[in-house]
């Protein structure tokens, strides 16, 4: 029973995705509502989630290599996805969506299993890994999304779209409060985190409204899924060797590197006018597969 209680998010993701599909097919809602939901998540849901997750987490020096590993995984995914997309002959918006899929890690799917299975030390290592990814997503990845969205030649527009992104400002504010030792009540942060987790559930609902049967069968969609987890785990193994990681730190780096496609790939693809069908379809498949392999992977993390 504990495993089901700890993973209500996975059940909610599956249910909301199904509701989105049914709503679109019955004409209750359409792609327009799906894009509106993603705009809500980007401007409101994600900032709330980031503040609740990062403002109070303990930052330790011994975890310094794990954020670096997360950043390296995302950057390597960028290069690999750009190469594969060009082999497919995808247009700019298709290449951009594939890059978003490769750069965005859905570590939030790992948290429920980690909270149930791991000790405090290993769980804090997962948080450290995720912080590196969060920092990259709302800086470099956001700029990359703007670039593929057609703003690369207009530097003022590129900077404005990046610097005015609410998640970026909340990320900096959260880290500043954390490093400054601001006395924020734990109960308040926990409540904010719960609100953010509920708000982010609008993404699978939007994915259901946006995904298509044709999209799920596209070869570039399958390639995006393989890049995120298959190529990601190879990069993770390489980084473990290069950084000399061992024990739970090595396991967290490998599992985190293979994490499913993050919902931020769908959100940023929507914001910048990229191939949303590709991003939503790939994320849907990746999340489903992650729900199968992540629980098994937890057994290999040293306690």
Predicted regions and their residues:
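Alpha-helical transmembrane segments of multi-pass small-molecule/ion transporters
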Residues: 1-303
């Amino acid at each position: 029973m504990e495993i089901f209680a700890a993973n209500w998010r996975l059940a909610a993701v599956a249910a909301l995705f199904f509701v989105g599909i049914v709503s679109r097919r019955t004409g209750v809602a359409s792609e327009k509502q799906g894009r509106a939901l993603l705009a809500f998540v980007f401007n409101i849901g994600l900032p709330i989630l980031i503040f609740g997750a990062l403002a109070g987490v303990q930052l330790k020096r011994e975890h310094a290599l794990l954020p670096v590993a997360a950043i390296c995984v995302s950057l390597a995914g960028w290069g690999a996805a750009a190469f594969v997309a060009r082999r497919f002959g995808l247009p700019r918006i298709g290449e951009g969506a594939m890059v978003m899929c490769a750069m965005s890690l859905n570590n939030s799917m790992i948290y429920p299993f980690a909270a149930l299975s791991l000790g405090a030390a290993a769980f804090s290592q997962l948080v450290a890994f995720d912080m590196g990814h969060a920092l990259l997503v709302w800086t470099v990845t956001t700029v990359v999304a703007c670039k593929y969205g057609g703003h690369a030649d207009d530097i003022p527009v590129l900077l404005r779209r990046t610097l005015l992104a609410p998640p970026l400002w909340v990320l900096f504010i959260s880290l500043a409060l954390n490093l400054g030792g601001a006395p924020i009540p734990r109960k308040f942060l926990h409540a904010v985190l719960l609100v953010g987790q509920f708000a982010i559930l609008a993404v699978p609902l939007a994915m259901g409204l946006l995904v298509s049967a044709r999209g799920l069968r596209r070869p570039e969609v399958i390639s995006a899924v393989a890049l995120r987890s298959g190529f990601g785990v190879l990069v993770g193994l390489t980084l473990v060797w290069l950084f000399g990681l061992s024990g739970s730190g090595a396991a967290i780096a490998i599992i985190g590197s293979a994490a499913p496609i993050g919902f931020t790939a769908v959100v940023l693809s929507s914001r910048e006018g990229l191939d949303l069908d590709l991003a939503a379809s790939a994320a849907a498949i990746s999340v489903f597969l992650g729900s199968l392999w992540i629980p098994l992977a937890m057994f290999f993390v040293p306690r």
